[in-house]
Amino acid sequence: MAVKLMLHPRNQHREGYDFERLVVKSPELEAFMTRNPRGQMTINFQDADAVRMLNRALLMTHYEIDFWDIPASYLCPPIPGRVDYIHYLADLLAKSNGQEIPHGSDIKALDIGTGASLVYPLTGRHEYGWDFTGVDIDPVSIKSARHICERNGLNIRLKRQNNAEDIFEGVVGSDDVFHVTLCNPPFHASLAQAQEGTQRKWRNLGKGHSAELNFGGQNAELWCPGGEIGFTARMIEQSKNFSEQCLWFTCLVSKKDSLKPLS
């Protein structure tokens, strides 16, 4: 397996996917496996069910999760890239901890937009033992995340954000203190832009548009006014009111070009 040098050095997935090991832990994955032109085992990454089964197998194999699933049409984020964010957060926290990466439940993390998959709390809890609170505006996402917690016996706090204009207000209590907040903001600035983005992906794949084929995601996951630049700008502004309650505020933007308007 080729080493993925773009991934963090501590990322378990730098050497790719060990499909033989994954199938042992999650036999359902085998039905979606195929071979690429080089004869290597893989899946069809344009098949939403295949990607969902791969995520389940990865979480079961590498992160000691016994149960994981998400509702149909909800975002199924790729595990390697998401856990990379967790590892870089650990490096960031080390800068405030004498260059030592902090482990254990004394470290409090707030996941803004935790989603139906709960991927950041699941991976961050396993890799570093941090204590997570997950927040989302979508009730189905909260229900799904809570179901994952219950089936795995996990004590991850979940909160519903009821006001689309607020990011921290209403979910960060007066007594709450966090070492870090994390967020993967909606990328698109409108529903039309999100739909065009999905269609463009399919055109690039030579698939053409299909109502049945999509890359997943609900409205709140895919778009918000101003897109990721607008969302991150609001987060920066609103974070000022909680500066005494959090050490680091962070956000993962998808495009390097988004950084300049935010600087």
What positions do the PLM features span?
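Conserved alpha-helix/loop element of class I SAM-dependent methyltransferases that forms part
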Residues: 57-62, 80-108
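S-adenosyl-L-methionine
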Residues: 135-183, 187-191
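Conserved SAM-binding loop of SAM-dependent methyltransferases across substrates and taxa
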Residues: 116-130
